[in-house]
Every structure is written in C-alpha cells, then in structure tokens.
Amino acid sequence: DENTCSMSHLGIALAGQVNAVSNLNAYVASGMFPGTHIHPITNGVHHETWTSPALANLFDEHLSGWRSDPTTLAHAGRLPDEPLEMARKDARAVLRDLVRAATGVELEEHRLTIGFARRFATYKRANLVFSDLERLRALGAGKIQFVFAGKAHPKDEGGKQLIRDIFEGASQVEQDIPVAFLEDYSMDTGLAMTSGVDIWLNNPIRPMEASGTSGMKAAMNGVPNCSI
C-alpha cells in the first residue's frame, strides 16, 4: 500500500546493524524479515537495582565484590541457609505491608505467594491461572495466594480485558485464595514483588515473548520461576 509505511522495514533499511533481545527472538525475527542478518544480544537487568536491601546486605557480607562484578553471584550457592532465609523473610514482610497498605488484602505469612507483574499484553496470558477456577481451588485453597501488578496500553482493549479477568477471577476465589492487584505499577512495586514472592509466574505464548526480564529480577532475590 503506497499510503502506508512499515516502521520495522524502514528501521531495518536504515540500520547499520539489527539486534534482537535473545536467541529465540533473533530466530523468530529472521523468519519475519527474510534476508536480514539479526544479531542476538540477550536482555539483562541491573543487578544492584533489582536486589532487595536485605539480600544486598547479605551479598555484601558473603560475596564481596558482587556490586562491581556480578559474576561473583555465581557463588550464591555458598550463602549460609539461616541468614538467607532471614533476608527472604524480610523481603516477604515488605511485600505484605505494601499489599495491605495499597489494597487492604491481608497476605498470610505461611502461604506460598505467587507473583506476576508485567505489561498486560495478551500473549503474556496474565489471566491463565483463572481459566479453571475449580482446579485452582482444588490445588490451592488454603495454600497459595497471588499478587498481580502491571499496566495495559490505553488503546490495548485485549490487555485491559486481562486486568478485568483478574479482578473477576479474584472475586470468585477470594474465600479460599487471596488475590491482590497493586495498581500504579512502578519500579518500587516491581522490586517489592520480585523480592517478596515465593514463586514468579511466567506463562507467555511461545515464541511471542522476545526475552522477558522480570524473572531475572526475581532470580536476583532467590525467587524461582515457574514457566508454563
């Protein structure tokens, strides 16, 4: 169409080098733009920014130099168990306090807390856990709780519907499974969540997730990813 312009093709034509944010992203993009050499440079996160104060203090004590050389964190398996658990406990308490103040939801200290905070794009499937409420209750009643956060683009109706789905699902299971949604997402909220949950939920439609960095932030705080 002579009246339209593809910004992707224009950018590729004018660029000296075309990069992707992961190996998978480069593979998928190469299929979308045949004949274009696409160089993968995997995304990352700034390690100091996304480490909770409690964990940072522990790293300072046992992993000297981690701030200037993050490869030092490869030795995190040597951290003593009890101080590590205390640091994780502090981070969990920060998140519980934030959720209580912002939403009124009382997270329970001894439940497994599952977190999900991202841009609400449809391919990220933020509402997937509510697709089978009976199964969710059977597996999680009295055992788990959820914290969600994020924003949808104002013109993304699908993304906004995901948020409505989460609120609807939360209302259906709230007697058995607490669900909190932290509004006005910010970096402070992101740090509290990625350091204060027990499991980080990741369930995008493959291969539409180009890289995904929130799980890297969680990993900085000893939080494992559950990828579906």
Residue ranges of each PLM-predicted region?
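Catalytic cores of carbohydrate-active enzymes across secretory and cytosolic contexts
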Residues: D1-I228
